[in-house]
Regions:
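Active-site loop-to-helix "anion-binding N-cap" substructures in soluble metabolic enzymes
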Residues: 1-348
Length: 348
């Protein structure tokens, strides 16, 4: 029988083995302080399952988009400290990012110990899925565990390339849970079924979106994704980000699913993220010198009303640049509305 999830592995195949766990610790950090550790906490069951069975656990993640440069503000060291608190035990951290330095750290790991590698995207080879880099990562471990659901679609070295070198490759509990949930929503969602899509790019979500939009009763769109749809409708979006290569698909979707797709009716905008003092709330049309960075209060109210009394909700991607307080309101309000809906019995 194929081994699909980490719990399918016999304890004998875990004890003493080096388990490389790809996680998603892309969390908001400012001045070394993590403002939201939800993504870290969600990986704890997988990590503890492995350590309780004597594995030597190697955690790896990205943080931000350093594009192959070492940027101190994008170091994962604060994550290792928070992880130590959550696990109640020390978590090692690889200061030395060279292959020899990393290997020396891992060779020194004892059973049930955990180490976190430095930001993988400090290496350009990670996002390039460079074969030798993939092979080097694979040489560090005996088992590959993918528990990074949010980045599993990316063809990077740590999410794709290195996995090809393992006989033992399985999903962690987080990925397994999300896949089960997606399968249920795809095959037999409870209705009314609401899909909420945010984040920066459509193309990162296109496969899931195409499947879910067919099943959904309503699709609420925010984040950077919304500006491609708004531009496709001929609405002035100022300097907001768009994906021009997705414009035709967005136009077709708006026609095909008319009445099902909801777009922001107002925005929190500014001249730039650096010039947040210029922050204003504008209606659907955004002035040329401004960029949209969050959904506005009218949109928040509208979307919350659409979330109430639903059978199932699928949410992927923030409503704005939530890492910055000035543009976090939309994401926070939607998160609270979904939490309330979940408490009332909605499948989320």
């Amino acid at each position: 029988m194929a081994k699909m999830v980490v719990s399918d592995l016999p304890d004998s195949e875990i004890e003493g083995k080096r388990a490389f766990v790809r996680v998603d610790f892309n969390v908001p950090i400012k001045d070394g302080v993590i403002s939201e550790d939800y993504r870290i906490r969600r990986t704890i069951p997988t990590i503890e399952y492995l350590t309780q069975r004597g594995a030597r656990v190697i955690l790896a993640s990205h943080l931000g988009r350093p594009r192959g440069r070492v940027i101190p503000d994008l170091s994962l060291r604060p994550v290792s400290l928070r992880l130590s608190e959550l696990l109640g035990k020390p978590v090692g951290f690889t200061e030395d990012g060279t292959r020899e330095g990393v290997k020396a750290t891992i060779d020194g790991l004892r059973e049930a110990e955990v180490v976190l590698l430095e930001n993988l995207r400090f290496h350009k080879e990670e996002t390039d899925n460079e074969p030798e880099f993939s092979k080097g990562l694979a040489s560090l471990a005996d088992i590959y565990v993918n528990d990074a659901f949010g980045t599993s679609h990316r063809k990077h070295a740590s999410t794709y390339g290195m996995a090809l070198y393992f006989d033992l490759r399985v999903a962690g509990f987080l990925v397994h849970r999300e896949l089960k949930f997606l399968t249920k929503l795809r095959d037999n969602p409870e209705h009314p079924f609401v899909v909420i899509v945010g984040g920066a790019k459509i193309k990162d979500k296109i496969s899931a979106l195409k499947n879910l939009i067919e099943k959904a009763d309503k699709v609420l769109i925010g984040g950077g994704v919304a500006y491609t749809f708004l531009k496709a409708k001929g609405i002035n979006i100022g300097g907001s980000i768009t994906e021009d290569e997705m414009m035709d698909w967005a136009k077709d979707a708006l026609l095909k699913y008319e009445g099902k797709i909801f777009l922001p009716v107002d925005h929190v905008a500014a001249e730039s993220l650096e010039k947040r003092r210029t922050r204003v709330v504008v209606d659907q049309e955004i002035p040329e010198e401004f960029k949209g960075f969050d959904i506005g209060p009218k949109t928040i109210t509208k979307y919350i009303s659409e979330i109430k009394d639903t059978g199932a909700i699928f949410w992927n991607g923030p409503m704005g640049v939530f890492e910055i307080d000035d543009f976090a309101s939309g994401t926070a309000h939607i998160a609270r509305a979904i939490a309330l809906a979940t408490w009332r019995g909605t499948t989320t």
